[in-house]
């Protein structure tokens, strides 16, 4: 069985490698699709990667991560943020619209987040890391659309209403993927660990 498993792994790796040229060939995409994403082809831009994400999802890839590097605005935030937002907004919006048009959005969970937010007050020409109150958004499979959950204080500094912890977020994400977070464990150094540790509650009010 171990030899058969190893052979299967090599065969899977080969199939993945040989599928890349077709995956990266955007010539079959319409002009309207390319323009909606804001890309001319597989050029490595964020917009191009958004389109690539849709193509990966069509081929059954279950986890896809996109990222944009340009948000580390410790300086020059006034000049940088508008352009950075535009680059992200167009491709992201096109991806959601494209998935919906293809009847894929209902089966795809989209999570837009970063590891922390930014302070509500400027520090020089930029803003520092901030973990006490920041936003993220979700769309697609199982998520209730058109709603805002939680709130910060009047300064935008502390989360004060319907605060969602990282463990709560993980519990909710796993629930949307059909996984009970209290049953999912990973064994490490003789102990079974949960992703949500001994915490985490599914946030039912954001579920469709």
Language model segments and positions:
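Ligand-binding pockets and gating/stacking loops
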Residues: 1-208
């Amino acid at each position: 069985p171990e030899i058969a498993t190893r052979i299967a792994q090599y065969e899977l790796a080969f199939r993945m490698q040989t599928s890349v040229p077709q995956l990266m060939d955007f010539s079959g995409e319409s002009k309207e699709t390319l323009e909606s994403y804001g890309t001319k082809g597989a050029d490595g831009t964020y917009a191009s990667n958004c389109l690539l994400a849709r193509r990966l999802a069509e081929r059954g890839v279950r986890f896809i991560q996109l990222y944009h590097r340009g948000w580390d605005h410790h300086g020059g935030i006034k000049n940088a943020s508008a352009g950075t937002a535009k680059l992200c907004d167009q491709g992201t919006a096109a991806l959601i619209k494209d998935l919906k048009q293809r009847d894929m959005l209902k089966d795809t969970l989209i999570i837009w987040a970063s590891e922390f937010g930014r302070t509500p007050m400027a520090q020089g020409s930029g803003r520092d890391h901030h973990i006490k109150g920041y936003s993220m958004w979700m769309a697609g499979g199982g998520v209730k659309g058109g709603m805002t959950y939680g709130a910060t204080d009047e300064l935008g500094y502390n989360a004060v209403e319907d605060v969602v912890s990282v463990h709560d977020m993980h519990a909710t994400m796993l629930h949307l993927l059909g996984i009970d977070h209290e049953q999912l464990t990973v064994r490490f150094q003789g102990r079974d660990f949960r992703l949500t540790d001994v915490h985490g509650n599914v946030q039912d009010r954001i579920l469709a």
